């Protein structure tokens, strides 16, 4: 299911991401802010486990997340979305997927996968700023499903309608959280209006 998150701060930071004059540092900070806000939405209704804690004065009821969270950034651009989330819990683990789509055609190349052990009781959150054709993300979800997590969600920043349609058709059970749904893909499969190549803008490369 597609879940576009509406928030004034997201719109403010998204404008910075789109602005071609933003420096890599400004791009990185805006990406971090939006990622945090989307993460709050992903985990808003996460199941909790009741525990007892001691305050300085007495015992009281408290809660902790029932399921572990595993982040899986799609390299490279997804790496910029990890740090804003891991600071919320020392128990968040991180896997990595190296997948890319060849610009000429729709062939997807999977070149790296490193996942934490025993994620069967985990909520996996895939991180990728751009959802363009959907072939890379659909491949990533299929790969992670082989590890049998309890739940898979996706945090992306900008998506094209074509990519949304492709991923929903392949994985209707996966929730996708977005900051924006853009107009279309151009002839080179870049999102329009988009924000350019997220990896290059994040790391200052070309």
From Swiss-Prot:
GO molecular function terms listed in the Swiss-Prot or TrEMBL record: GTP binding; magnesium ion binding; uracil phosphoribosyltransferase activity
Q: In which pathway does it act?
A: Pyrimidine metabolism; UMP biosynthesis via salvage pathway; UMP from uracil: step 1/1
The entry's free-text remark on the cofactor is:
Binds 1 Mg(2+) ion per subunit. The magnesium is bound as Mg-PRPP.
Tell me what this protein is called: Uracil phosphoribosyltransferase
Q: How is it regulated at the activity level?
A: Allosterically activated by GTP.
Q: What is its EC number?
A: 2.4.2.9
Q: What does this protein do?
A: Catalyzes the conversion of uracil and 5-phospho-alpha-D-ribose 1-diphosphate (PRPP) to UMP and diphosphate.
Q: What class of enzyme is it?
A: transferase
| Entries under InterPro entries matching the protein | PRibTrfase_dom, PRTase-like, Upp_B, UPRTase/APRTase, Ura_phspho_trans
What gene name does this entry carry? upp
Q: Name one GO biological process term.
A: uracil salvage
Which residues are 5-phospho-alpha-D-ribose 1-diphosphate-binding? 76, 101, 128-136, 197
Naturally occurring in which organism (per UniProt): Mycoplasma pneumoniae (strain ATCC 29342 / M129 / Subtype 1)
Q: Which cofactor does it need?
A: Mg(2+)
Keywords for the protein's UniProt record, in alphabetical order: Allosteric enzyme, Glycosyltransferase, GTP-binding, Magnesium, Nucleotide-binding, Transferase
Q: Where does uracil bind?
A: 191, 196-198
Q: Which NCBIfam families match?
A: PRK00129.1, upp
Family in the record? Belongs to the UPRTase family.
What is catalyzed by this enzyme? UMP + diphosphate = 5-phospho-alpha-D-ribose 1-diphosphate + uracil
